Amino acid sequence: DDQGHTHRNLVRKSVRNLSPAERRSLVHALKSLQEDSSADGFQSLASFHAQPPLCPYPEANKRFACCVHGMATFPEWHRLYTVQFEDALRRHGSVVGIPYWDTVVPQEDLPAFFNDEIWDDPLFHANFTNPFNGADIDFNHQKIARDINVDKLFKEGPKGYDTWSFKQYIYALEQEDYCDFEVQFEIAHNAIHAWVGGTEEYSMGHLHYASYDPVFILHHSNTDRLFALWQELQKFRGHDPNEVNCALEMMREPLKPFSFGAPYNLNPTTKEHSKPEDTFDYKGHFHYEYDHLELQGMNVQRLHDYINQQKERDRVFAGFLLEGIGTSAHLDFSICKIDGECTHAGYFDVLGGSLETPWQFDRLYKYEITDVLESKGLDVHDVFDIKITQTSWDNEDISTDRFPPPSVIYVPK
């Protein structure tokens, strides 16, 4: 290609499985990218997501964030975005794809790859600030901050392996309708933004600044891996993994700012494939692949079997019709009996900011409540309320009036 590389596929590996040479190449590449002040440097690429805003076009008087959330093209926009960073890192010397941080498995510690403040390079007897530990936000003279919620990140499920993220992604992967999958998938992905950013403004938890934290690309490499896993499951289920059955017009609409071209997007590959429908064939178009497409050690066959096992009992879900509220938010909900006794039933997060593109899902986000109802001796036909509380990223209470009351959905086996 025009960068002097042959088109061999880069492999995206777990951050915990990188060889010393791979880790060194990534650290030096990101350090170099962060020092690159061109239109293809770190600050420019970070601005693709939200701030300084480039949409609807850079010369517009009133601009908003280009990143896609709350819409069917969320997976495709972020696939392009990881490619944008991956190609930039390769130009700066990386020999491996963007590694992924697998947060579906119970975490015992935070990976040193991004948690160590100092990078010690034993080969060259050098040490310097680890570029994956943070970054400057040049346009407003701030630095990325983290307020990591280790309680949620390290929390095992009742059986150990069945973490919050595992259960959320399993239900997303169960969906054979693309748009049903997308809603579940996107909300599941939001959790890591909230758990890494916490109550910090200049962080993963805020739509405007998330992409300035290098953890963003590690998280989105994993998010994209789970999207690729869904594609493999679709193939296994007899569907075309490169086709969707909904939002067809959106799939033909080029995604910004990738479609802009120079002087904003200098990457010819993401410009050429800026239509969402052109992102499905990621190996052919973007030349990367994953070391493992699995969830908690389950390959596609075993995952398919596990998903079918979940369907062998009657299930009850709480259904939420979500829309953007101009900020990131944490939602908790409880099941309340008619005598007033309430039991905590679940939680999820929304990623947002004042510059977000207005959005509203056209279908429900579903959260399973079968076990909570059983523990309280409730049947789906009994009378109970679902009570929501909503707080902003900085722990301010938010009115829940924006959302219609949750639905109760019964799914027989």
Swiss-Prot record:
InterPro entries: Di-copper_centre_dom_sf (IPR008922), Haemocyanin_beta-sandwich (IPR028999), Haemocyanin_C_sf (IPR036848), Tyrosinase/Hemocyanin (IPR050316), Tyrosinase_Cu-bd (IPR002227). GO terms for molecular function: metal ion binding; oxidoreductase activity; oxygen carrier activity. Hemolymph. Glycans are attached at residues 17, 127. Cu cation B binds at residues 189, 193, 220. Disulfide bonds join 55-66, 179-246, 336-342. Binds 2 copper ions per heterodimer. It is found in: Secreted, Extracellular space. It holds the Pfam family Tyrosinase. Keywords: Copper, Disulfide bond, Glycoprotein, Metal-binding, Oxygen transport, Secreted, Thioether bond, Transport. Cu cation A binds at residues 49, 69, 78. Gene3D superfamilies: Di-copper center containing domain from catechol oxidase (1.10.1280.10), Haemocyanin C-terminal domain (2.60.310.10). There is a cross-link at residues 67-69 (2'-(S-cysteinyl)-histidine (Cys-His)). GO terms for cellular component: extracellular region. Its cofactor is Cu(2+). It comes from the Eukaryota. Hemocyanins are copper-containing oxygen carriers occurring freely dissolved in the hemolymph of many mollusks and arthropods. Decamers of large identical subunits, each containing 8 globular oxygen-binding functional units. Belongs to the tyrosinase family. Hemocyanin subfamily. This is Hemocyanin type 2 unit e.
